[in-house]
Amino acid sequence: MANSPHGGVLKDLLARDAPRHDQLAAEAESLPAIVLSERQLCDLELIMNGGFSPLEGFMNQKDFDGVCENCRLADGNLFSMPITLDASQQVINELKLQAGSRVTLRDFRDDRNLAILTIDDIYRADKEKEAKLVFGGDPEHPAIKYLNTKVEEFYIGGKIEAVNKLNHYDYVALRYTPAELRIHFDKLGWSRVVAFQTRNPMHRAHRELTVRAARARAANVLIHPVVGLTKPGDIDHFTRVRAYQALLPRYPNGMAVLGLLGLAMRMGGPREAIWHAIIRKNHGATHFIVGRDHAGPGKNSKGEEFYGPYDAQHAVEKYKDELGIEVVEFQQVTYLPDTDEYKPKDEVPAGVKTLDISGTELRNRLRTGAHIPEWFSYPEVVKILRESSPPRHTQGFTVFLTGYQNSGKDAIARALQVTLNQQGGRAVSLLLGDTVRHELSSELGFSREDRHTNIQRIAFVASELTKAGAAVIAAPIAPYEHSRKAAREAVSQHGSFFLVHVNTPLEYCEKTDKRGIYAKARAGEIKGFTGVDDPYEAPENAHLTVDVSKQSVRSIVHEIILLLETEGFFDRA
Protein backbone atom coordinates (compact mmCIF):
# COMPACT_ATOMS: atom_id res chain seq x y z
CA MET A 1 0.00 0.00 0.00
CA ALA A 2 1.33 3.47 -0.94
CA ASN A 3 2.45 5.99 1.66
CA SER A 4 -0.23 8.29 3.10
CA PRO A 5 -0.29 11.83 1.67
CA HIS A 6 1.30 14.74 3.50
CA GLY A 7 -1.29 16.18 5.86
CA GLY A 8 -3.34 12.98 5.72
CA VAL A 9 -5.51 13.71 2.66
CA LEU A 10 -4.51 13.92 -1.00
CA LYS A 11 -5.82 17.28 -2.20
CA ASP A 12 -6.83 16.12 -5.69
CA LEU A 13 -8.78 19.22 -6.71
CA LEU A 14 -9.37 17.92 -10.24
CA ALA A 15 -11.26 14.92 -8.88
CA ARG A 16 -12.98 16.95 -6.15
CA ASP A 17 -14.32 19.59 -8.53
CA ALA A 18 -15.11 17.34 -11.53
CA PRO A 19 -18.87 17.07 -10.67
CA ARG A 20 -19.11 20.89 -10.89
CA HIS A 21 -17.06 21.20 -14.08
CA ASP A 22 -19.75 22.68 -16.32
CA GLN A 23 -20.80 25.23 -13.71
CA LEU A 24 -17.19 26.26 -12.99
CA ALA A 25 -16.28 26.40 -16.69
CA ALA A 26 -19.19 28.74 -17.40
CA GLU A 27 -18.27 30.97 -14.46
CA ALA A 28 -14.62 31.07 -15.51
CA GLU A 29 -15.64 32.56 -18.86
CA SER A 30 -17.37 35.45 -17.10
CA LEU A 31 -14.58 36.35 -14.67
CA PRO A 32 -11.50 38.54 -15.14
CA ALA A 33 -8.45 36.40 -15.89
CA ILE A 34 -4.80 36.24 -14.90
CA VAL A 35 -2.63 34.65 -17.58
CA LEU A 36 -0.09 32.42 -15.87
CA SER A 37 3.63 32.22 -16.57
CA GLU A 38 5.39 28.91 -17.16
CA ARG A 39 6.48 28.63 -13.53
CA GLN A 40 3.01 29.52 -12.27
CA LEU A 41 1.56 26.82 -14.54
CA CYS A 42 3.91 24.23 -13.06
CA ASP A 43 2.87 25.26 -9.55
CA LEU A 44 -0.83 25.27 -10.39
CA GLU A 45 -0.70 21.78 -11.90
CA LEU A 46 0.83 20.33 -8.74
CA ILE A 47 -1.66 22.21 -6.56
CA MET A 48 -4.59 20.86 -8.59
CA ASN A 49 -3.43 17.23 -8.78
CA GLY A 50 -2.39 17.00 -5.12
CA GLY A 51 1.36 16.95 -5.62
CA PHE A 52 1.63 19.91 -3.24
CA SER A 53 -0.79 18.50 -0.63
CA PRO A 54 -1.91 19.82 1.80
CA LEU A 55 -2.04 23.03 -0.27
CA GLU A 56 -5.39 23.86 -1.89
CA GLY A 57 -4.27 27.09 -3.50
CA PHE A 58 -1.60 29.75 -3.60
CA MET A 59 -0.32 30.83 -0.19
CA ASN A 60 -1.88 33.74 1.66
CA GLN A 61 0.30 35.99 3.81
CA LYS A 62 -0.02 33.88 6.97
CA ASP A 63 1.10 30.77 5.11
CA PHE A 64 3.85 32.66 3.30
CA ASP A 65 5.25 34.14 6.52
CA GLY A 66 5.06 30.81 8.34
CA VAL A 67 6.81 28.91 5.55
CA CYS A 68 9.56 31.51 5.20
CA GLU A 69 10.18 31.84 8.93
CA ASN A 70 9.84 28.26 10.21
CA CYS A 71 8.79 25.89 7.39
CA ARG A 72 5.21 25.84 8.69
CA LEU A 73 1.86 26.57 7.11
CA ALA A 74 -0.58 28.54 9.27
CA ASP A 75 -2.30 25.26 10.24
CA GLY A 76 1.00 23.87 11.55
CA ASN A 77 1.74 21.48 8.69
CA LEU A 78 5.36 21.22 7.57
CA PHE A 79 6.02 22.90 4.21
CA SER A 80 9.34 24.38 3.17
CA MET A 81 8.84 26.29 -0.09
CA PRO A 82 6.66 29.39 -0.67
CA ILE A 83 4.12 28.67 -3.43
CA THR A 84 2.88 32.09 -4.46
CA LEU A 85 1.00 33.79 -7.28
CA ASP A 86 2.64 37.10 -8.14
CA ALA A 87 0.91 39.96 -9.96
CA SER A 88 1.70 43.57 -10.75
CA GLN A 89 -0.14 46.56 -9.34
CA GLN A 90 -1.31 47.29 -12.89
CA VAL A 91 -2.95 43.87 -13.27
CA ILE A 92 -4.56 44.12 -9.83
CA ASN A 93 -5.98 47.55 -10.67
CA GLU A 94 -7.12 46.65 -14.19
CA LEU A 95 -8.92 43.51 -13.00
CA LYS A 96 -10.21 45.28 -9.86
CA LEU A 97 -8.98 42.48 -7.63
CA GLN A 98 -9.50 42.48 -3.87
CA ALA A 99 -10.12 40.05 -1.03
CA GLY A 100 -13.22 38.02 -1.85
CA SER A 101 -12.89 38.47 -5.62
CA ARG A 102 -12.94 35.44 -7.89
CA VAL A 103 -10.52 35.37 -10.80
CA THR A 104 -9.85 32.89 -13.59
CA LEU A 105 -6.35 31.44 -14.00
CA ARG A 106 -5.55 30.97 -17.68
CA ASP A 107 -2.88 29.06 -19.62
CA PHE A 108 -0.70 31.36 -21.75
CA ARG A 109 -0.01 28.52 -24.20
CA ASP A 110 -3.54 27.81 -25.43
CA ASP A 111 -5.71 30.42 -23.67
CA ARG A 112 -7.61 27.71 -21.75
CA ASN A 113 -9.21 28.42 -18.40
CA LEU A 114 -7.63 26.12 -15.82
CA ALA A 115 -8.97 27.21 -12.45
CA ILE A 116 -10.85 29.79 -10.43
CA LEU A 117 -9.08 31.45 -7.50
CA THR A 118 -11.09 32.95 -4.65
CA ILE A 119 -8.84 35.68 -3.27
CA ASP A 120 -8.07 35.47 0.42
CA ASP A 121 -5.65 38.39 0.48
CA ILE A 122 -3.33 40.50 -1.67
CA TYR A 123 -0.04 41.38 0.00
CA ARG A 124 3.25 42.95 -0.93
CA ALA A 125 5.87 40.36 -1.84
CA ASP A 126 8.58 40.46 0.83
CA LYS A 127 11.35 39.46 -1.56
CA GLU A 128 14.09 40.27 0.93
CA LYS A 129 12.63 37.91 3.54
CA GLU A 130 12.06 35.16 0.98
CA ALA A 131 15.56 35.52 -0.46
CA LYS A 132 17.29 35.45 2.92
CA LEU A 133 15.26 32.87 4.85
CA VAL A 134 14.42 30.43 2.05
CA PHE A 135 17.43 30.62 -0.27
CA GLY A 136 20.25 31.96 1.90
CA GLY A 137 20.45 35.54 0.65
CA ASP A 138 23.20 35.31 -1.98
CA PRO A 139 22.06 37.63 -4.82
CA GLU A 140 23.70 35.30 -7.35
CA HIS A 141 21.40 32.41 -6.39
CA PRO A 142 19.18 31.69 -9.43
CA ALA A 143 16.00 31.74 -7.33
CA ILE A 144 16.93 35.13 -5.88
CA LYS A 145 17.77 36.44 -9.35
CA TYR A 146 14.33 35.25 -10.44
CA LEU A 147 12.74 36.99 -7.46
CA ASN A 148 14.50 40.26 -8.23
CA THR A 149 14.03 40.28 -12.00
CA LYS A 150 10.86 38.30 -12.79
CA VAL A 151 8.54 38.31 -9.78
CA GLU A 152 5.99 41.13 -9.57
CA GLU A 153 5.49 43.28 -6.49
CA PHE A 154 2.37 41.63 -5.02
CA TYR A 155 1.31 38.09 -4.09
CA ILE A 156 -2.30 36.91 -4.36
CA GLY A 157 -3.34 34.20 -1.90
CA GLY A 158 -6.42 32.03 -2.03
CA LYS A 159 -7.98 28.63 -2.65
CA ILE A 160 -8.36 27.03 -6.06
CA GLU A 161 -11.29 25.36 -7.77
CA ALA A 162 -10.11 23.24 -10.70
CA VAL A 163 -11.73 23.71 -14.11
CA ASN A 164 -9.43 21.91 -16.56
CA LYS A 165 -6.16 20.04 -16.30
CA LEU A 166 -3.17 21.33 -18.24
CA ASN A 167 -2.72 19.98 -21.75
CA HIS A 168 0.54 18.19 -22.47
CA TYR A 169 1.60 16.85 -25.84
CA ASP A 170 4.80 15.07 -24.85
CA TYR A 171 5.17 11.80 -22.93
CA VAL A 172 1.55 11.94 -21.82
CA ALA A 173 1.52 8.29 -20.68
CA LEU A 174 4.42 8.99 -18.28
CA ARG A 175 2.89 12.08 -16.63
CA TYR A 176 1.25 10.34 -13.67
CA THR A 177 -0.72 12.39 -11.17
CA PRO A 178 -0.23 11.36 -7.52
CA ALA A 179 -3.55 9.48 -7.58
CA GLU A 180 -2.64 7.68 -10.82
CA LEU A 181 0.78 6.68 -9.53
CA ARG A 182 -0.72 5.34 -6.31
CA ILE A 183 -3.18 3.24 -8.32
CA HIS A 184 -0.29 2.01 -10.48
CA PHE A 185 1.71 0.95 -7.42
CA ASP A 186 -1.31 -0.91 -6.05
CA LYS A 187 -1.84 -2.65 -9.38
CA LEU A 188 1.80 -3.79 -9.37
CA GLY A 189 1.55 -4.88 -5.75
CA TRP A 190 4.29 -2.48 -4.62
CA SER A 191 4.24 -1.50 -0.94
CA ARG A 192 7.77 -0.08 -0.59
CA VAL A 193 8.91 2.44 -3.19
CA VAL A 194 12.26 4.27 -3.35
CA ALA A 195 11.89 7.53 -5.30
CA PHE A 196 14.86 8.94 -7.20
CA GLN A 197 14.85 12.62 -8.17
CA THR A 198 17.01 13.87 -11.03
CA ARG A 199 17.27 16.67 -13.56
CA ASN A 200 20.19 15.05 -15.40
CA PRO A 201 20.64 11.99 -17.62
CA MET A 202 21.19 8.72 -15.76
CA HIS A 203 24.18 6.45 -16.30
CA ARG A 204 25.47 3.14 -14.90
CA ALA A 205 26.31 4.63 -11.51
CA HIS A 206 22.75 5.92 -11.07
CA ARG A 207 21.31 2.56 -12.01
CA GLU A 208 23.66 0.91 -9.52
CA LEU A 209 22.85 3.18 -6.59
CA THR A 210 19.07 2.98 -7.12
CA VAL A 211 19.19 -0.82 -7.38
CA ARG A 212 21.33 -0.98 -4.22
CA ALA A 213 18.89 1.29 -2.37
CA ALA A 214 15.93 -0.84 -3.43
CA ARG A 215 17.67 -4.14 -2.70
CA ALA A 216 18.61 -3.05 0.84
CA ARG A 217 14.99 -2.15 1.60
CA ALA A 218 13.19 -4.91 -0.33
CA ALA A 219 11.62 -2.11 -2.37
CA ASN A 220 10.97 -1.04 -5.94
CA VAL A 221 12.24 2.07 -7.71
CA LEU A 222 10.37 5.14 -8.92
CA ILE A 223 12.55 7.08 -11.35
CA HIS A 224 10.91 10.51 -10.97
CA PRO A 225 12.80 13.13 -13.03
CA VAL A 226 11.79 16.78 -13.16
CA VAL A 227 10.53 17.86 -16.59
CA GLY A 228 9.23 21.31 -15.65
CA LEU A 229 11.69 24.15 -15.10
CA THR A 230 15.18 23.16 -14.01
CA LYS A 231 18.53 24.96 -14.01
CA PRO A 232 19.39 27.04 -17.11
CA GLY A 233 21.85 25.09 -19.22
CA ASP A 234 20.48 21.67 -18.24
CA ILE A 235 19.96 19.09 -20.98
CA ASP A 236 16.42 19.43 -22.35
CA HIS A 237 13.83 17.07 -20.94
CA PHE A 238 13.01 15.51 -24.33
CA THR A 239 16.55 14.15 -24.56
CA ARG A 240 16.60 13.12 -20.92
CA VAL A 241 13.33 11.21 -21.10
CA ARG A 242 14.49 9.29 -24.17
CA ALA A 243 17.64 8.42 -22.21
CA TYR A 244 15.61 7.30 -19.17
CA GLN A 245 13.45 5.13 -21.41
CA ALA A 246 16.58 3.56 -22.92
CA LEU A 247 17.97 2.89 -19.44
CA LEU A 248 14.82 1.30 -17.99
CA PRO A 249 15.34 -2.19 -19.55
CA ARG A 250 18.71 -2.34 -17.75
CA TYR A 251 16.87 -2.74 -14.43
CA PRO A 252 15.78 -6.20 -13.28
CA ASN A 253 12.39 -6.96 -14.80
CA GLY A 254 9.58 -5.36 -12.80
CA MET A 255 11.87 -3.43 -10.45
CA ALA A 256 11.49 0.15 -11.74
CA VAL A 257 8.85 2.54 -13.08
CA LEU A 258 9.47 5.84 -14.86
CA GLY A 259 7.16 8.77 -14.08
CA LEU A 260 7.62 12.44 -14.99
CA LEU A 261 7.21 15.38 -12.60
CA GLY A 262 6.27 18.78 -14.04
CA LEU A 263 7.91 20.71 -11.21
CA ALA A 264 9.42 24.18 -11.44
CA MET A 265 12.59 23.75 -9.39
CA ARG A 266 13.97 26.63 -7.33
CA MET A 267 17.42 25.04 -6.76
CA GLY A 268 16.83 25.69 -3.07
CA GLY A 269 19.12 23.08 -1.53
CA PRO A 270 17.97 22.10 2.01
CA ARG A 271 14.53 23.72 1.70
CA GLU A 272 14.03 22.14 -1.70
CA ALA A 273 15.03 18.69 -0.43
CA ILE A 274 12.25 18.82 2.19
CA TRP A 275 9.83 19.99 -0.52
CA HIS A 276 10.89 17.17 -2.84
CA ALA A 277 10.35 14.64 -0.06
CA ILE A 278 6.82 15.96 0.52
CA ILE A 279 6.05 15.75 -3.20
CA ARG A 280 7.31 12.14 -3.44
CA LYS A 281 5.34 11.19 -0.34
CA ASN A 282 2.22 12.59 -2.02
CA HIS A 283 3.00 10.43 -5.05
CA GLY A 284 3.04 7.34 -2.84
CA ALA A 285 6.76 6.78 -2.28
CA THR A 286 7.89 5.37 1.06
CA HIS A 287 11.60 6.20 0.64
CA PHE A 288 13.40 9.11 -1.00
CA ILE A 289 17.03 9.32 -2.11
CA VAL A 290 18.68 12.61 -1.09
CA GLY A 291 22.05 13.25 -2.65
CA ARG A 292 25.09 15.32 -1.89
CA ASP A 293 24.21 19.01 -2.47
CA HIS A 294 20.68 17.93 -3.40
CA ALA A 295 18.95 20.55 -5.60
CA GLY A 296 21.85 22.95 -5.14
CA PRO A 297 22.56 25.49 -7.89
CA GLY A 298 26.30 24.82 -8.01
CA LYS A 299 28.79 27.61 -7.36
CA ASN A 300 28.62 31.39 -7.39
CA SER A 301 30.98 33.67 -9.32
CA LYS A 302 33.56 33.35 -6.53
CA GLY A 303 33.64 29.58 -6.93
CA GLU A 304 31.81 29.05 -3.63
CA GLU A 305 28.99 26.55 -3.08
CA PHE A 306 25.65 28.10 -2.14
CA TYR A 307 25.06 25.33 0.42
CA GLY A 308 27.15 22.82 2.33
CA PRO A 309 27.47 19.40 0.68
CA TYR A 310 25.30 17.65 3.29
CA ASP A 311 22.94 20.49 4.29
CA ALA A 312 20.07 18.96 2.31
CA GLN A 313 20.49 15.53 3.90
CA HIS A 314 20.62 17.08 7.38
CA ALA A 315 17.49 19.16 6.70
CA VAL A 316 15.42 16.17 5.60
CA GLU A 317 16.79 14.05 8.45
CA LYS A 318 15.73 16.76 10.93
CA TYR A 319 12.09 16.43 9.87
CA LYS A 320 12.06 12.72 8.98
CA ASP A 321 9.46 11.71 11.57
CA GLU A 322 7.09 14.46 10.52
CA LEU A 323 7.71 13.89 6.82
CA GLY A 324 6.77 10.24 7.12
CA ILE A 325 9.10 9.19 4.34
CA GLU A 326 12.39 7.39 4.94
CA VAL A 327 15.48 9.26 3.76
CA VAL A 328 18.00 7.27 1.75
CA GLU A 329 21.34 9.05 1.72
CA PHE A 330 22.82 9.07 -1.76
CA GLN A 331 25.92 6.88 -1.84
CA GLN A 332 28.78 8.05 -4.02
CA VAL A 333 29.71 5.00 -6.09
CA THR A 334 32.85 4.44 -8.15
CA TYR A 335 33.86 1.96 -10.85
CA LEU A 336 36.37 -0.81 -10.15
CA PRO A 337 37.86 -1.86 -13.51
CA ASP A 338 39.58 -4.98 -12.18
CA THR A 339 36.28 -6.53 -11.13
CA ASP A 340 33.97 -4.64 -13.55
CA GLU A 341 31.64 -3.41 -10.82
CA TYR A 342 30.49 -0.31 -9.00
CA LYS A 343 30.90 0.04 -5.25
CA PRO A 344 30.26 2.80 -2.71
CA LYS A 345 33.46 4.79 -2.34
CA ASP A 346 33.62 4.19 1.40
CA GLU A 347 33.65 0.41 0.79
CA VAL A 348 36.62 0.41 -1.59
CA PRO A 349 39.84 -0.84 0.07
CA ALA A 350 42.89 1.39 -0.07
CA GLY A 351 45.03 0.88 -3.15
CA VAL A 352 42.25 -0.56 -5.32
CA LYS A 353 42.09 1.09 -8.74
CA THR A 354 38.97 3.15 -9.43
CA LEU A 355 37.65 5.14 -12.39
CA ASP A 356 35.26 8.08 -12.55
CA ILE A 357 34.13 10.60 -15.17
CA SER A 358 32.92 13.97 -13.87
CA GLY A 359 29.98 15.86 -15.32
CA THR A 360 32.37 18.41 -16.81
CA GLU A 361 34.44 15.67 -18.44
CA LEU A 362 31.30 14.04 -19.85
CA ARG A 363 30.19 17.34 -21.40
CA ASN A 364 33.66 17.79 -22.90
CA ARG A 365 33.52 14.30 -24.42
CA LEU A 366 30.09 14.95 -25.87
CA ARG A 367 31.26 18.30 -27.22
CA THR A 368 34.38 16.92 -28.86
CA GLY A 369 33.00 13.54 -29.88
CA ALA A 370 35.55 11.73 -27.67
CA HIS A 371 34.91 8.14 -26.58
CA ILE A 372 32.57 7.51 -23.64
CA PRO A 373 33.32 4.05 -22.20
CA GLU A 374 30.62 1.45 -21.54
CA TRP A 375 31.70 1.16 -17.91
CA PHE A 376 30.42 4.72 -17.45
CA SER A 377 27.21 4.69 -19.50
CA TYR A 378 25.25 2.31 -21.67
CA PRO A 379 25.72 2.64 -25.47
CA GLU A 380 22.01 3.25 -26.05
CA VAL A 381 22.07 6.18 -23.60
CA VAL A 382 25.24 7.65 -25.09
CA LYS A 383 23.73 7.44 -28.59
CA ILE A 384 20.75 9.55 -27.49
CA LEU A 385 22.97 12.12 -25.78
CA ARG A 386 25.19 12.41 -28.85
CA GLU A 387 22.17 13.01 -31.07
CA SER A 388 21.20 16.00 -28.91
CA SER A 389 24.77 17.16 -28.20
CA PRO A 390 26.54 17.14 -31.56
CA PRO A 391 30.28 17.85 -31.73
CA ARG A 392 31.24 21.50 -31.31
CA HIS A 393 32.21 21.90 -34.98
CA THR A 394 28.55 21.32 -35.99
CA GLN A 395 26.97 23.51 -33.30
CA GLY A 396 25.61 27.00 -33.76
CA PHE A 397 27.04 30.13 -32.14
CA THR A 398 26.51 33.89 -31.98
CA VAL A 399 29.15 36.58 -32.39
CA PHE A 400 27.71 39.77 -30.87
CA LEU A 401 29.50 42.98 -31.91
CA THR A 402 28.85 46.10 -29.84
CA GLY A 403 30.17 49.64 -30.13
CA TYR A 404 29.42 53.21 -31.16
CA GLN A 405 27.66 54.16 -34.37
CA ASN A 406 30.24 54.07 -37.22
CA SER A 407 32.74 52.16 -35.07
CA GLY A 408 33.25 49.58 -37.82
CA LYS A 409 30.82 46.95 -36.53
CA ASP A 410 29.01 46.55 -39.84
CA ALA A 411 32.21 46.25 -41.87
CA ILE A 412 33.56 43.62 -39.48
CA ALA A 413 30.23 41.75 -39.50
CA ARG A 414 30.03 41.64 -43.30
CA ALA A 415 33.64 40.52 -43.65
CA LEU A 416 33.13 37.85 -40.99
CA GLN A 417 30.02 36.63 -42.81
CA VAL A 418 32.01 36.15 -46.02
CA THR A 419 34.81 34.37 -44.17
CA LEU A 420 32.44 31.97 -42.42
CA ASN A 421 30.58 31.26 -45.65
CA GLN A 422 33.91 30.42 -47.25
CA GLN A 423 34.71 28.14 -44.31
CA GLY A 424 31.42 26.25 -44.83
CA GLY A 425 29.82 23.70 -42.54
CA ARG A 426 26.89 25.81 -41.31
CA ALA A 427 24.47 28.52 -42.42
CA VAL A 428 25.49 32.09 -41.58
CA SER A 429 22.98 34.79 -40.58
CA LEU A 430 23.70 38.51 -40.35
CA LEU A 431 21.73 40.80 -38.01
CA LEU A 432 22.92 44.37 -38.62
CA GLY A 433 21.59 47.13 -36.40
CA ASP A 434 19.92 49.15 -39.17
CA THR A 435 18.42 46.04 -40.77
CA VAL A 436 16.88 44.88 -37.50
CA ARG A 437 15.52 48.35 -36.81
CA HIS A 438 13.83 48.35 -40.23
CA GLU A 439 12.58 44.76 -40.31
CA LEU A 440 11.84 43.89 -36.66
CA SER A 441 11.71 47.07 -34.58
CA SER A 442 10.38 49.80 -36.84
CA GLU A 443 7.82 50.89 -34.23
CA LEU A 444 10.43 51.33 -31.49
CA GLY A 445 12.03 54.62 -30.58
CA PHE A 446 15.37 55.23 -28.88
CA SER A 447 14.37 55.45 -25.24
CA ARG A 448 16.27 53.22 -22.83
CA GLU A 449 13.30 50.84 -22.67
CA ASP A 450 12.91 50.66 -26.45
CA ARG A 451 16.62 50.07 -26.96
CA HIS A 452 16.49 47.22 -24.46
CA THR A 453 13.48 45.73 -26.24
CA ASN A 454 15.31 45.93 -29.56
CA ILE A 455 18.30 44.02 -28.18
CA GLN A 456 16.01 41.36 -26.70
CA ARG A 457 14.42 40.85 -30.10
CA ILE A 458 17.85 40.42 -31.65
CA ALA A 459 18.74 37.97 -28.88
CA PHE A 460 15.58 35.96 -29.46
CA VAL A 461 16.25 35.61 -33.18
CA ALA A 462 19.93 34.83 -32.54
CA SER A 463 19.07 32.17 -29.95
CA GLU A 464 16.65 30.40 -32.29
CA LEU A 465 19.15 30.45 -35.17
CA THR A 466 21.93 29.29 -32.87
CA LYS A 467 19.75 26.44 -31.63
CA ALA A 468 19.26 25.40 -35.26
CA GLY A 469 23.03 25.21 -35.78
CA ALA A 470 23.65 28.49 -37.59
CA ALA A 471 26.48 30.97 -37.17
CA VAL A 472 24.88 34.28 -36.18
CA ILE A 473 26.61 37.66 -36.44
CA ALA A 474 24.77 40.46 -34.65
CA ALA A 475 26.02 44.05 -34.81
CA PRO A 476 23.81 46.49 -32.89
CA ILE A 477 25.11 49.42 -30.86
CA ALA A 478 23.72 47.74 -27.70
CA PRO A 479 24.88 50.52 -25.35
CA TYR A 480 23.61 49.08 -22.05
CA GLU A 481 25.30 46.37 -20.01
CA HIS A 482 22.05 44.86 -18.69
CA SER A 483 20.75 44.42 -22.24
CA ARG A 484 23.92 42.66 -23.36
CA LYS A 485 23.84 40.38 -20.30
CA ALA A 486 20.24 39.45 -21.04
CA ALA A 487 21.18 38.72 -24.66
CA ARG A 488 24.07 36.52 -23.52
CA GLU A 489 21.77 34.58 -21.18
CA ALA A 490 19.15 34.07 -23.89
CA VAL A 491 21.59 32.79 -26.52
CA SER A 492 23.66 30.72 -24.08
CA GLN A 493 20.68 28.47 -23.40
CA HIS A 494 21.07 27.11 -26.94
CA GLY A 495 24.71 27.62 -27.88
CA SER A 496 27.84 29.68 -27.46
CA PHE A 497 27.82 33.48 -27.27
CA PHE A 498 30.88 35.59 -28.01
CA LEU A 499 30.87 39.29 -27.15
CA VAL A 500 33.19 41.47 -29.23
CA HIS A 501 33.63 45.07 -28.08
CA VAL A 502 34.43 47.25 -31.07
CA ASN A 503 36.21 49.85 -28.95
CA THR A 504 36.85 52.41 -31.66
CA PRO A 505 37.19 55.86 -30.00
CA LEU A 506 34.19 58.17 -30.24
CA GLU A 507 36.33 60.89 -31.83
CA TYR A 508 37.36 58.56 -34.65
CA CYS A 509 33.76 57.40 -35.19
CA GLU A 510 32.63 61.01 -35.42
CA LYS A 511 35.51 62.15 -37.63
CA THR A 512 34.95 59.38 -40.20
CA ASP A 513 31.14 59.68 -40.23
CA LYS A 514 30.28 60.19 -43.91
CA ARG A 515 26.52 60.18 -43.26
CA GLY A 516 26.67 63.22 -40.99
CA ILE A 517 24.67 61.56 -38.22
CA TYR A 518 26.94 62.76 -35.42
CA ALA A 519 26.74 66.32 -36.76
CA LYS A 520 22.96 66.17 -36.62
CA ALA A 521 23.10 64.84 -33.07
CA ARG A 522 25.50 67.61 -32.02
CA ALA A 523 23.12 70.13 -33.57
CA GLY A 524 20.22 68.74 -31.56
CA GLU A 525 18.40 67.35 -34.58
CA ILE A 526 18.66 63.79 -33.19
CA LYS A 527 17.90 63.17 -29.52
CA GLY A 528 19.15 60.29 -27.36
CA PHE A 529 22.14 59.58 -29.60
CA THR A 530 24.72 57.21 -28.10
CA GLY A 531 27.97 59.01 -27.30
CA VAL A 532 26.43 62.48 -27.62
CA ASP A 533 23.53 62.76 -25.18
CA ASP A 534 23.10 59.12 -24.20
CA PRO A 535 25.82 57.00 -22.56
CA TYR A 536 27.58 53.92 -23.87
CA GLU A 537 28.39 51.46 -21.07
CA ALA A 538 31.59 49.61 -21.92
CA PRO A 539 31.26 45.80 -21.64
CA GLU A 540 32.57 44.24 -18.45
CA ASN A 541 33.45 40.82 -19.89
CA ALA A 542 34.04 40.95 -23.63
CA HIS A 543 35.70 37.94 -25.27
CA LEU A 544 37.58 40.29 -27.59
CA THR A 545 38.21 44.02 -27.65
CA VAL A 546 39.16 45.51 -31.02
CA ASP A 547 39.67 48.99 -32.47
CA VAL A 548 39.17 49.89 -36.14
CA SER A 549 41.26 53.05 -35.71
CA LYS A 550 44.30 50.86 -34.96
CA GLN A 551 43.52 47.55 -36.70
CA SER A 552 42.37 46.55 -40.15
CA VAL A 553 39.03 44.83 -40.60
CA ARG A 554 40.91 41.82 -41.98
CA SER A 555 43.05 41.45 -38.84
CA ILE A 556 40.00 41.81 -36.58
CA VAL A 557 38.13 39.11 -38.49
CA HIS A 558 41.20 36.90 -38.19
CA GLU A 559 41.15 37.38 -34.39
CA ILE A 560 37.51 36.32 -34.28
CA ILE A 561 38.20 33.28 -36.46
CA LEU A 562 41.08 32.27 -34.19
CA LEU A 563 38.79 32.57 -31.15
CA LEU A 564 36.19 30.33 -32.82
CA GLU A 565 38.86 27.85 -33.88
CA THR A 566 40.28 27.68 -30.37
CA GLU A 567 36.79 26.91 -29.05
CA GLY A 568 36.47 24.01 -31.52
CA PHE A 569 33.90 25.43 -33.93
CA PHE A 570 35.75 24.30 -37.04
CA ASP A 571 36.27 20.66 -38.01
CA ARG A 572 39.84 19.67 -37.19
CA ALA A 573 39.62 16.24 -38.81
Curated annotation (Swiss-Prot):
It is an enzyme of class 2 (transferase). Residues 1-169 are annotated as: N-terminal. Residues 170-394 are annotated as: Catalytic. GO terms for cellular component: cytoplasm. 3'-phosphoadenylyl sulfate binds at residues 434-437, 451, 477-478, 515. It is found in: Cytoplasm. The record marks 330 as: Induces change in substrate recognition on ATP binding. Pathway: Sulfur metabolism; hydrogen sulfide biosynthesis; sulfite from sulfate: step 1/3. Sulfate binds at residues 197, 199, 295. GO terms for molecular function: adenylylsulfate kinase activity; ATP binding; sulfate adenylyltransferase (ATP) activity. In the N-terminal section; belongs to the sulfate adenylyltransferase family. In the C-terminal section; belongs to the APS kinase family. This is Sulfate adenylyltransferase.
